[in-house]
Regions:
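Nucleic acid-processing catalytic cores of prokaryotic defense/repair systems
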Residues: 1-112
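Mixed-charge intrinsically disordered linker/loop segments at interdomain junctions
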Residues: 73-148, 558-575
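Preference for the N-terminal adenyl/adenosyl cofactor-binding alpha/beta module
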Residues: 86, 113-345, 349, 372, ...
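Short, ligand-facing micro-motifs at secondary-structure edges
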Residues: 520, 693-710, 728, 732, ...
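Non-catalytic DNA-recognition/assembly elements of restriction-modification systems
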Residues: 590-632, 652, 769-960
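Basic, amphipathic alpha-helical recognition segments used for DNA target recognition
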Residues: 683, 712-764, 772-775, 933-960
Length: 960
């Protein structure tokens, strides 16, 4: 047996159905043709492939192919983990990170080396641990600050900007697209057949570098490519381009392509090391979406879409549809660089390809794009990039050795329109087409364009804050018919804003469409949208079809390491809920509750509101004033009655139970932008910051009897001396952990964007009173040591929970102990232990007894606290014997092959991107298997799981 095979077996990969040896790569139907082609070129001994992505590759000759730059090729392929047999030891490399050696060659970054004896199933890179977030620290530490994508972005941004700014080349983007296209043809081994550019890749790369230094030679090559392949990319405005291109600019371009040009940013220029035969073209497309630049983003409010998010959307729409069909018409109404269209075209071409992944029929391949792919963009450079990306995609599905008769289709202003989506005259051509899918990431925010505003006005729709995405959301419904599914990335704020235009928009959506899925991304916004932390959601719906009893799949992603390290969307079981559409219509709060909670939280909050007064009720009853402070920026409002008074420093004056009366300045203006009734500056009052404490989402509030002015970033609840206890009680509530739960469940901003509290929302929170809380607040405000404050805060939190009868509520505890720390980045991952699992089992037992205690059927619960360091399980075995132990622990089953098979741990481990809990039934027992992370075995999960199993048993289902 070869040593590499021993390594695979010792690490546990050999039992997985997702391990593919090189000769079997084509049997992996989840893998794209591009990735299969890349794997065949890299020729690893084997690859571990999960959900269509290569996660781990195994080599026993990584450094033994002198004629092949394997390190460079693997880095271009961005394969995360490389396990290499290197004779006396086993070395692990990070395939997404590299160092540039002295000899100017790419070398993958070393992670660690092992003796063969150290390769076992407990190893950090074993089959069980490469998908275990508790075991990824070594890999995480080996990551470069930048991956290939980011290097390529920096490189292309640098040269494009230099050509535009220093050499005044207005078509610099298009020039670089041509360069990239030619490099792609060369790297693919296409015999261009001009000036020595043949199928010898290295030789052709050198010839192209020579051509690029001579303007006449370069133009001659572009004209030749236009004549040979047709297409919009090679159309030349000779007079303009000849005037703008200079010999000096071509020298700079040549030096950039050879890495001789030193980038002023100090970043590495890696262009000679890129292999465009391996780099997916959708990456180039996506990069150019970024390169269109801040100017486009600021003007058109268009932000780039991460590739893995596009994959998710296209797979669940176009991909699923093509399981039974051959093609489908797709529109992206704001196509940007065309990544949605490229991914959709790839699906169509793959479905129509022959067994080798290519399409021989040149007419058919053009027909597939001309009859199925449509896009619009307001930016002409974006249209050019889209067409470039589609052209390269067409080449990607053809044998580079048989392109003699191939002519690219002309797509500009036929399929891919340059113009305003809301210019009804110009859009008539594409509006008559029967689309199966409308996909995209439309611009967000208020844009200086007229047509979309008129479009909304004509339909009596108010786009709150001038939000252009609202207009896109409406128009795609008009273009689509009952068979059209739309899937759009939208600012999630439109789902939570409480003002009437947003409420009306949600009702309109729920009434006029069948909502298929909501993918909520707010919790992972900083991981997904780099440089733009606006919260997003993907809304997928059927046009012109209302179905209020239809169940909506609601998914709210949570932060996880896989998104950061592997660039994949991981959906955990608790992220998914199924909700009747009518419930959203009847309960507008449900949109926000579901982001971090579920049905149990919805029920709990409904009970709280019915059982307790609201803060609004207390404000009215005691004639309190609830207001925010003044705006002291320049304005015309008379402030002479406030001039010369102390105004608090919003940042330094207030914290939890803390008031710094020395943190102030003097108001010296006679007029300001906005004043407020002067009574609110007269103590006593509770002052609290508008911005939440981002470490735990609590409100920073303090009671004081000192008079001050304060700005709008500080709110107040003002009363009289007779209201002191009420104010102290309110101060305690605002600072409590329970109110951070309310903030996350009911506040439109908390956990979404900017983390603020709005007074209109706060007024609706449930209110309770306790003299114990009042005393705690008084003590808290006088305490001085950190230790004393921490102990008092714990007591205060428990006191408030008791006031609401929630001291033992598992769902509130889950949000406070897990959801909020996850969101705030303070959560410490850990494994569950026997004590935790016994508590889980006892809750399960209690609920089971409530339903079946008198049935004469008894049961035992076996606890398996650690299976392969990755999973834990409980098995409930039914019996008519009441003498057996009710709950017991089984310590080690790692070598019990039949039990591992019964528990389906291999199948579970191979589906980690869409993690599932296994609930498997047999004749007299059932088993629950989940990841070993403590959060999955929390008491709240025990309650949820118990009722899932009960439903399955009572409804006669074999699974749940």
């Amino acid at each position: 047996m070869r040593t590499i095979e021993k390594i695979i077996r010792r690490l546990g990969y050999h039992n997985s159905e997702k391990l593919f040896y090189l000769s079997d790569i084509d049997k992996c139907v989840d893998l794209s043709w591009h990735d299969r082609r890349v794997l065949r070129e890299l020729a690893p001994y084997a690859a571990y492939i999960v959900d269509g992505s290569v996660l781990t590759v195994f080599f026993d000759d990584l450094n033994d192919r002198p004629d092949v730059d394997l390190h460079g090729k693997i880095w271009n392929a961005q394969m995360p983990i490389v396990i290499s047999d290197e004779g006396n030891y086993v070395k692990i490399y990070n395939g997404k990170s590299m160092d540039l050696g002295i000899e100017k060659k790419i070398r993958l970054r070393d992670i660690i080396s092992y003796d063969l004896s150290q390769c076992d199933e407990e190893n950090e890179f074993s089959y069980w641990n490469v998908t275990n977030s508790l075991s990824l620290d070594l890999y995480e530490r080996s990551m470069c600050k930048k991956n290939l994508n980011e290097f390529l972005i920096d490189n292309l941004r640098y040269i494009t900007k230099k050509l535009k700014d220093e050499f005044k080349i207005s078509f610099a983007n298009k020039l670089m697209l041509r360069v990239l296209f030619i490099r792609y043809l060369i790297d693919r081994g296409v015999n261009i057949g001009y000036m020595g550019l043949g199928d010898n890749v290295k030789q052709s790369q050198e010839i192209f570098l020579s051509i690029i230094q001579n303007k006449n030679d370069f133009w001659a090559l572009v004209k030749y490519l236009k004549e040979r392949f047709n297409g919009n990319l090679f159309e030349i405005d000779e007079e303009k381009e000849d005037a703008e291109i200079t010999d000096a600019s071509l020298v700079v371009l040549h030096d950039f392509l050879t890495a001789k040009e030193e980038m002023r940013t100090g970043q590495l220029c890696l262009f000679p090391f890129y292999d465009f035969n391996i780099i997916p073209i959708e990456l180039i497309s996506n990069i150019y979406e970024i390169l269109l630049g801040k100017e486009k983003q600021n003007r058109d409010k268009a932000f780039y879409t991460p590739e893995y998010l596009v994959d998710y959307i296209v797979n669940r729409t176009v991909g699923n549809y093509l399981i039974k069909e051959n093609e489908c018409k797709v529109l992206d109404p704001s196509c940007g660089s065309g990544i949605f269209l490229v991914k959709s075209l790839q699906k169509i071409l793959e479905h129509n390809a022959e067994s080798n992944g290519f399409l021989k029929d040149k007419e058919k391949i053009n027909k597939l794009v001309e009859e199925n792919i449509y896009g619009v963009d307001y930016n002409e450079e974006a249209v050019d990039v889209t067409i470039f990306s589609l052209y390269v995609t067409l080449f990607d599905y053809q044998d580079p050795k048989s392109l003699e008769d191939f002519r690219l289709p002309l797509l500009k202003n036929k399929n891919i329109l340059y113009g305003d989506f809301f210019d009804e005259e110009n859009m008539k051509a594409i509006e008559k087409i029967d689309y199966k899918f409308i996909l995209g990431n439309p611009p967000w925010g208020s844009v200086n364009q007229h047509n979309y505003k008129k479009y909304c006005d004509d339909r009596n729709v108010i786009a709150q804050d001038g939000e252009i995405s609202v207009a896109f959301l409406l128009k795609v419904q008009e273009i689509g018919d009952v068979d059209t599914e739309c899937s759009l990335i939208l600012p999630s704020k439109i789902l939570y804003k409480g003002k009437s235009p947003s409420v009306a928009l949600r009702k309109r959506l729920l009434t006029n469409t069948q909502l298929e899925q909501v993918l909520e991304l707010s919790a992972v916004r900083k991981q997904i949208f780099k440089g733009a932390i606006a919260p997003a959601a993907v809304l997928s719906f059927q046009c012109q079809k209302s179905a209020l009893n239809h169940k909506v799949e609601y998914i709210s992603l949570k932060p996880n390491k896989y998104l950061k390290l592997f660039g994949v969307i991981m959906i955990e079981p608790d992220d998914v809920k199924y909700v009747k559409q009518t419930l959203f219509l009847e309960n507008d709060d449900l949109w926000k509750i579901l982001v971090y909670g579920g049905y149990w939280d919805f029920e709990l909050l409904s009970i709280m509101r019915n059982k307790f007064k609201s803060i609004r009720d207390v404000v009215i009853e005691h004639k309190l004033i609830l207001k925010k402070g003044l705006q002291d920026s320049d304005g015309s409002k008379d402030a002479s009655h406030l001039t010369g008074r102390k105004i608090l420093d919003s940042d330094k004056a207030i914290d939890h139970f803390y008031f710094n009366d020395n943190a102030y300045s003097m108001l010296n203006k006679l007029t300001i932008r906005r004043t407020v009734i002067p009574e609110i500056y007269q103590a006593p009052y509770v002052l609290f910051k508008k911005g939440l404490d981002c470490t735990d989402y609590t409100i920073r509030a303090v009671y004081t009897e000192k008079d001050f002015l304060y700005r709008e970033t500080i709110n107040c609840i003002k009363g009289s001396e007779a209201d002191k206890k009420i104010l102290l009680n309110l101060c305690g509530l605002l600072n409590s952990s329970l109110f951070s739960y309310f903030n996350l469940m009911l506040g439109s901003s908390a956990g979404i964007e900017r983390e603020q509290i709005f007074l209109k929302e706060l007024e609706d929170y449930p209110y309770a009173y306790s003299d114990e809380l009042v005393e705690l607040v008084q003590t808290m405000q006088q305490s001085e040591t950190i230790e004393e404050k921490e102990e008092l805060q714990k007591n205060l939190n428990q006191c408030v929970l008791r006031m609401y009868g929630l001291q033992d509520n598992s769902f509130v505890d889950y949000v406070l102990s897990t959801q909020i720390p996850l969101l705030c980045g303070t959560y410490q991952e850990k494994k569950c232990d026997v004590k935790m699992m016994k508590e889980y089992a006892s809750i399960f037992s209690k609920i089971w007894d409530e339903h079946f205690g008198q049935s004469g059927v008894y049961y035992t619960i076996a606890i398996y606290p650690d299976i392969k360091g990755k999973f834990a399980a409980i098995r409930i075995k039914l019996s008519f014997d009441d003498s057996v132990d009710n709950i017991y622990v089984v310590d080690n089953i790692n070598e019990d092959v039949s039990l591992l098979a019964d528990f389906m741990v291999y199948q579970l481990n191979d589906c980690f991107y869409q993690a599932k809990n296994v609930v498997e039934f047999s004749e007299d027992s059932f088993v629950i298997v989940k990841s070993i992370e403590a959060k999955n075995w929390h008491p709240a999960m025990a309650i949820k799981d118990s009722y899932k199993v009960l439903n399955a048993v009572l409804l006669g289902k074999g699974d749940c």
